[in-house]
């Protein structure tokens, strides 16, 4: 599971060092895909494949679901961590997420999110009231 907030820097070659505490769960490979709110999502390879198969099976008759699966699959970048725990973030993914040098990696329970630091700060500020107010549906299984 993935928890916490980290602030790695994107290097000049588009590589990002992932936090050491997450590397064991990603040692068998990972998938980088477009995420929600112009972030990137990183899933352990096997977790992603399970989810992708479920989504693909459910999407055959629903046009919105088919579009989601197509976009998800088209954005998927299968990778392995290098010896220093880095991934290469493609130019297309950097552009989609607006990544510059300063990044934020957050644990989102079963996957990671990569954000541009400024975008994460703005998103967090804009949604602080939502978190503080709580959401019975969102928190029903947690509280």
UniProtKB/Swiss-Prot annotation:
GO biological process: negative regulation of DNA-templated transcription initiation
InterPro entries on file: MraZ, MraZ_C, MraZ_dom, MraZ_N, MraZ_sf, SpoVT-AbrB_dom, SpoVT-AbrB_sf
Main location: cytoplasm
Keywords attached to this entry: Cytoplasm, DNA-binding, Repeat, Transcription, Transcription regulation
Residue intervals passing through the bilayer: none
Family the entry assigns: Belongs to the MraZ family.
Protein name per Swiss-Prot or TrEMBL: Transcriptional regulator MraZ
């Amino acid at each position: 599971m993935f928890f916490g907030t980290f602030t790695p820097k994107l290097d000049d070659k588009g590589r990002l060092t992932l936090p050491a505490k997450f590397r064991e769960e990603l040692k068998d490979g990972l998938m980088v895909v477009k995420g929600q709110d112009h972030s990137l999502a990183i899933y352990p390879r096997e977790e992603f494949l399970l989810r992708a198969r479920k989504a693909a099976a459910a999407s055959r008759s629903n046009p919105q679901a088919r579009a989601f699966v197509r976009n998800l699959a088209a954005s998927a970048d299968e990778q392995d961590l290098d010896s220093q725990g880095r991934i290469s973030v493609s130019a297309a993914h950097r552009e989609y997420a607006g990544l510059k040098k300063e990044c934020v990696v957050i644990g989102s329970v079963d996957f990671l999110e990569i954000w541009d630091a400024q975008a994460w700060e703005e998103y967090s500020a804009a949604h602080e009231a939502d978190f503080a107010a709580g959401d019975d549906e969102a928190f029903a299984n947690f509280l």
